């Protein structure tokens, strides 16, 4: 039985072995068939590539597409509120160079030499070349002679100092440069220097970015270069731009400035601009309006793609996206008014300069109290240059410099008294010198007025009334020769109300670097509260003073000052101002925490200042047809400038006055203009320069209004 079982098992194994043998050849055949199909497909595809698509692929092998080249476009323009151009773009015929990838210094030199035959470089560009520039150029022109400047022994010394690789190359290069003599540099001809100036411009920027070689080329140069572009790889002729100011220096400091292509992007903001598709050498707004509205003014660059061969030669250029000039800004400023305001400032500074040597600046702000639009933002400053007196634009001083403003802030003091219930309308105090324990000098008005109420106090500018109001806010009744016990909380309380008018806080103007003024000493000295109440403690800017007066003029709404009125598209015709893209709506920053009847009561006091016989401003403003109201101011201070003329023999700052003025018109209807005048560091507090300037600028505003009553509007694109 065992033997039979073994025989059966042997037969089974033989059957299974036969089955396996029959399966293996079948699988091999399938595999060979698949391989055959794959090879057939590859052969067919190769045939297609060689026979059908061969020419196409040969062309693709011989060329490559480089990165997109961006070409800058003109910035947006700026117009005044009447549609007159303030900032324009002057077109300039320009020669540029775009360095392609793979182009070496020898190829650049060839192009520079060919270009030097066609254009003449400005002397200033050649004067900017450094000795290092010239030595490097000499080495490029005299490679064999330059190589002999450093011996193998020199290199061996460096290696002994364990200097190898790139560091060794750098040391060798520096030593070669150092050993070039002045005689060898003198071998460079005038033509060589001109070639070097061109080459330096060509190498100044970044690859694939057009670099300006020469701007404002002559018509002949532009023509001959354009004709020879085929033999000048990388060179192009185009029309560039530079900022142009039809009104010269008027408002220039506020308009801001634009960087040059050499300055390019600021290092501290490089990443910010690069992620926004700027090139490193792009021109951008550096300051104020140009900087604040960079995103609006910059525009969209034209982008094109250069198709090149293996050698880097451009076969053709394909435009990817069409460029678009920046959008335009319509400012709130009235340029005709601005000119007249600046003329007034300059005229008065010149007239008073001989008798007022410390008085070197003056400011005016005019704004619409209903919407916050700035109508004029003007400042002038006397500087000594080249041994003579010059007057420069200092409009920025209206928002970045601050001064004690004197009695112009008394309206805020009275209103703070009302709101804290320290006083009421028509509250009376007796105006006479006030004496306090520990003080040798009395606190008094410029004149003793006797029994007066709040309106009379504003009209004649009583200091004593304001002192009593401040004491009442502090919870103190005046007793002669008593000590003052005023806590810091009273300062905080008064500042709370002053700040509601914009005094001591940002005005919110759409420009950077605004000053909020300076607080007086923070230690708790009671007498300083009295100084604060008459504007002789904290400092404020001329713009803050104008916002304060606007807030009173419009019934208690603090409006955000705006210098840009609209953003407009580029028009199709130059005489148009473009369609409105965005209008800047008026912004109410806050409503003052004061009863409207209180504000109107103070406005009556301001009317009396300008219109009643013994008002401090009546001598200048009484009876004028445009019915102005406001407040004069005189602050005792010390010289705050840098000139030695403001210091005595012991180097102490001399005492002087800040003369100020603020107001609005008309007083008997909705006021349409509010203004401030600040003239710091005056010797003679009776000079009246503040009132003279104030009248001149108000006259100018209403004269222009009359002249324009029948004028035709500026055309707007449809």
Predicted regions and their residues:
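Solvent-exposed, polar/charged alpha-helical surfaces in well-ordered, non-transmembrane soluble domains
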Residues: 106-113, 117, 223, 227, ...
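Short loop/turn motifs at secondary-structure junctions and domain boundaries
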Residues: 66-71, 353-360
